[in-house]
Amino acid sequence: MFDHYIGLLNEKDISLVVTADHGMKAKTNTNGEPNAIFLEDFLKEKFPQDNFKVILPITDPYVVHHGSLGSFAMIYVENQELIPHVLEEIKKIPEIEEVLNKQDACKTYHLPEDRSGDIVCMSSESFTIGSSKSKHDLSSLKEPLRSHGGLHEREVPFIINSSKSDISKQLQIYNYDAFYYATHMANK
């Protein structure tokens, strides 16, 4: 169906760019069961006297495939002196691939400091991050868990209908480049 509609558009005298806002990866074990790390539970076990808030940007009511679990999380730490210790504990979790303090995360990923947590985490390719097991009802999943938000879901299609483009000269193309290529091709 998708190919049919793209074909119809391509027949017109237009510049056409097809891309996506993000990729999607399976987040299950070999039995098809969800792979999730619940960071708030983990931190409360390691630091029972302290308060943490794990924020998952993916959390929304549409839980059909991702169960409100994503590959990206921000952690707010009440006791700021604990941040280096919390960072070290999270780095020990093999399924967490990237753990950065706020300053490094903002610099590396161009995040706004005033809206970022004290710690930023990203899971490995086949795992998701949740806050607390009690906050994620995975029984409503009808399909195997899939999600996005991390380093492994950045790859997206980028299709253009022009051979006049200089796209092959680009080392890195982002989905937000679609507007540039659509307008650039229109002028040729």
Residue spans of the language-model regions?
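Feature captures the catalytic ectodomains and active-site-proximal regions of enzymes
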Residues: M1-K188
